[in-house]
Curated annotation (Swiss-Prot):
It comes from Saccharomyces cerevisiae (strain ATCC 204508 / S288c) (Baker's yeast). Belongs to the SNF2/RAD54 helicase family. InterPro entries: Helicase_ATP-bd, Helicase_C-like, P-loop_NTPase, SNF2-like_sf, SNF2/RAD54-like_C, SNF2_N, SNF2_RAD54_helicase_TF, Znf_C3HC4_RING-type. Residues 623-777 form the Helicase C-terminal domain. ATP binds at residues 210-217. Coiled coil: none annotated. One of its GO terms (cellular component) is nucleus. GO terms for molecular function: ATP binding; DNA binding; helicase activity; hydrolase activity; zinc ion binding. It is an enzyme of class 3 (hydrolase). Present with 358 molecules/cell in log phase SD medium. The gene is RAD16. Component of the global genome repair (GGR) complex composed of at least ABF1, RAD7 and RAD16. Interacts with ELC1. It is found in: Nucleus. This is DNA repair protein RAD16. SMART domains: DEXDc, HELICc, RING.
Length: 790
């Protein structure tokens, strides 16, 4: 820098206040409240140590009076403003208001650019003028994929418009089918007309979703009788309902339909033989088994063998799924087995087509084969397929585009928005689309809507409350104190959900003790898990009802493990086995394990207890005996059904009732279909048989027990729908007597809390649009805390 040139020093390591010359008034051409600035004429006077700290092009010398305060002159004004008094003179005002004039004496060379040019790099940017043009809204990924789908698949544009414009269903009554011995009710004739018209429509089937107990089976049999030339028909039903289908077909058709039960080890393997029948009856378990053996094979000592499935190699005229929610999991082997059947007409019968979430409806729609809702569409080309085929797990087998470029119609247009927005905005539109579809493929009537046609008698529900005796009270308080201590330790460690199985066991033991102390005490002293022929559920510690096995070889009641699995929904905890705590892998629809019934009876709790004169009954059992004595009459026999979730409790009740002079029969999950049928027939036809003991896990659904009019539920459960279904076994078409349902509850026990929890969950069911039964079945951490605070 030339001698005599203007030197300004600027600190670069800290943030300083700046003054803009443009903001100074004409009188104040100097910076106010600043320290005396000493400006030196040449760079030789600058200390070497300061040169390292400051930049060479400008140097600021601070006042010795205040080393902690820096001041910077921000030279951002124009040269004209800066040289108002003199072209080469600058004025700075010090603390004493003295004007200091500084002259610059240097020649401007080519190498020495004016300050204004040097300031260009630090000059403030001018604000950009806002555009007055309105920007178009940003396209979301969902909208982008929708546009791409419409571009490559233009037929999708009018799917919902066509559904909305379809003519609404107008109820009409069909004529009574020839050959039926039972006269159909008016609403059932309307149902028959709808069934016939649906088979002739583009849907070739649908969902009959009448409420439980309104005669879905009878209406379906009427459809079979409408045209006897249209056969064969396949009916897939739960094991407990198999014989009921056979009996009702034989009873109401005068034997005009030829029936074959495809069940058991002696079932036929001849396709021509099956084609000669009008109706083939089978179970979901058998259908899944033959499908698995055909596609995946089965192991023997000599290797892996595959066996063709007779059911999957016959062209049926129609396939009917009873209790169709059994295929609600579209990824289950049972759903795959059903979807691979060959048929022209497809039907789903279910009083609860939606149990857990709306997505489960897709499995039924997929079985019904309703296009385009079941197809996967490519957003890059016109590829469309019902099957998800990506052999290399990356590229489509049909068009070679990647997975992310394919989407399912039902998922894209009907589920995504509901999952994201609920039933508001775009979610409400998707929800309305689902309702529009269901109006075209589903018929649902309730008992309240058709009360005049049904003519059902009133149903009364009461709760009988009793108290422990002194001995039971001491035992319960001891067990409760120990259980609460363990539960509190889980809460303190923050591992409640990780120990759901352990907490489930604690609750189960308290529930069992409220039934009878022996259910807990003898279980702790003599656990029969290794007894031959007996399968013990490792969740409820009772004889397993419909036992199924996990891949880690642990056995559970089908209902117990189902509720356990559902408890992990909507949280991030890993689903683990409740016994060994490794990742749980289990098929909830697999066939039940075979149980030796004779060994089962030998190992019942009665055979393990000393049932001599020293045996003591319980408060609850004696309360049941008292209620049954009240029903006895010399004029008529009033039949009753007793439900319990614990087969050991039913064993004790059976022994006590026989001692009291009551004739009983018992239905258990270990029975074969034939044994179940014989037991039900004996109860219905034998006047002397007064009490039917039923395991809630085995007989809660698909039973018609309208011969009884009294229902006793011994142990309450937190899912109220379980008890509602048990009541529907009696309060249904064919019932002409008032129905009374009595629920037993021991006060000052966990049962009182469960009753309160039931009421809370029942209110939630009636208050919500989407009845999410999975949420009802689950015990949340708040529910667990509620149960342990009695």
């Amino acid at each position: 820098m030339q001698e005599g040139g203007f030197i300004r020093r600027r600190r670069t390591r800290s943030t300083k206040k700046s003054v803009n010359y443009n903001e100074l008034s004409d009188d104040d051409t100097a910076v106010k409240n600043s320290k005396t600035l000493q400006l030196k004429g040449n760079s030789e006077n600058v200390n070497d140590s300061q040169d390292e700290e400051y930049r060479d092009d400008a140097t600021l010398v601070k006042s010795p009076d205040d080393d902690d305060k820096d001041f910077i002159i921000d030279l951002t004004g124009s040269d004209k403003e800066r040289t108002a008094t003199d072209e080469n003179t600058h004025a700075i005002k010090n603390d004493n208001d003295e004007i200091i004039e500084i002259k610059e004496e240097r020649d401007v060379s080519d190498d020495d650019e004016p300050l204004t040019k040097k300031r260009k790099t630090t000059a403030r940017k001018k604000k950009k003028k806002t555009s007055t043009k309105k920007k178009s809204p940003k396209v979301t990924p969902y909208e982008r994929n929708t546009l791409r789908l419409y571009e490559h698949h233009p037929e999708l544009r009018n799917v919902f418009t066509d559904l909305k414009n379809a003519p609404p269903y107008v109820p009409q009554r069909s004529k009574q089918p020839d050959g039926m011995t039972i006269k159909l009710l008016p609403f059932q004739l309307e149902g028959l007309h709808w069934l016939i018209s649906q088979e002739e429509s583009i849907y070739a089937g649908g969902v009959l979703a009448d409420e439980m107990g309104m005669g879905k089976t009878i209406q379906t049999i009427a459809l079979l009788m409408n045209d006897l030339t249209k056969s064969p028909s396949l009916v897939v039903a739960p094991t407990v309902a198999l014989m009921q289908w056979k009996n009702e077909i034989e009873q109401h058709t005068k034997g005009q339909l030829k029936i074959y039960i495809y069940h058991g080890a002696s079932r036929t393997t001849d396709i021509k033989d099956l084609q000669g029948y009008d109706v083939v009856l089978t179970t979901y378990a058998v259908l899944e088994s033959v499908f698995r053996k055909q596609n995946y094979g089965f192991r023997r000592k000599n290797g892996l063998f595959k066996q063709p499935s007779v059911l999957h190699n016959i062209d049926f005229y129609r396939v009917i799924l009873d209790e169709a929610h059994n295929i609600k999991d579209r990824q289950s082997n049972t759903a795959r087995a059903v979807n691979n059947l060959k048929t022209q007409k497809r039907w789903c019968l279910s009083g609860t087509p939606l149990q857990n979430r709306i997505g489960e409806m897709y499995s039924l729609i997929r079985f019904l084969n309703i296009n385009p809702f079941t197809k996967y569409f490519c957003t890059k080309c016109d590829c469309a397929s019902k099957d998800w085929k990506f052999t290399d797990r990356m590229h489509c087998d049909h068009c070679s585009h990647v997975i992310m470029q394919h989407t399912n119609f039902f998922n894209h247009f009907m589920l995504k928005n509901i999952q994201k927005f609920g039933v508001e905005g775009p979610g409400l539109e998707s929800f309305n689309n689902i309702q529009t579809l269901l109006k075209n493929i589903m018929l649902r009537r309730t008992k309240v809507e058709r009360a005049d046609d049904l003519g059902l008698p009133p149903r009364i529900v009461t709760v009988r409350r009793d108290f422990f005796n002194e001995e039971e009270k001491d035992l319960y308080r001891s067990l409760y104190t120990d259980s609460k201590r363990k539960y509190n330790s889980f809460v303190e460690e923050g591992v409640v959900l990780n120990n759901y199985a352990n907490i489930f066991t604690l609750i189960t033991r308290m529930r069992q003790l409220a039934d009878h102390p022996d259910l807990v005490l003898k279980r702790l002293n003599n656990f029969p898990g290794d007894d031959i022929g007996v399968v013990i559920c490792q969740l409820c510690n009772d004889e397993a009802e419909e036992p199924i096995e996990s891949k880690c070889h642990h056995k559970f009641c089908r209902l117990c493990i189902k509720e356990y699995v559902e408890s992990f929904m909507e949280n991030n905890n890993k689903l683990t086995c409740p016994v060994c705590h490794i990742g749980l892998s289990i098929d909830l629809s697999q066939p039940a394990l075979e149980v030796d019934l004779d060994s089962f009876k030998k190992q019942s709790i009665v055979s393990r207890l000393n049932m001599s004169g020293k045996w003591q009954s319980s408060t609850k059992i004696e309360a049941l005996v008292e209620e049954l004595y009240k029903l006895r009459s010399n004029k008529r026999t009033i039949k009753s059904i007793v439900f319990s979730q614990f087969t050991s409790m039913l064993d004790l009740v059976e022994w006590r009732l026989k001692r009291a002079g009551f004739q009983t029969v018992k239905l258990q999950g270990s029975m074969s279909p034939t044994q179940r049928d014989e037991t039900i027939k004996y109860f219905m036809n034998n006047i002397q048989c007064e009490v039917f003991l039923v395991s809630l896990k085995a007989g809660g659904v698909a039973l018609n027990l309208c011969e009884a009019s009294q229902v006793f539920i011994l142990d309450p459960w937190w899912n109220p729908s379980v008890e509602w279904q048990s009541g529907d076994r009696v309060h249904r078409i064919g019932q002409y007597r008032p129905v009374k349902i009595t629920r037993f509850c021991i006060e000052d026990s966990i049962e009182a809390r469960i009753i309160e929890l039931q009421e809370k969950k029942a209110n939630m069911i009636h208050a919500t649009i989407n009845q999410d039964e999975a949420a009802i079945s689950r015990l949340t951490p708040a529910d667990l805390q509620f149960l342990f605070n009695n």
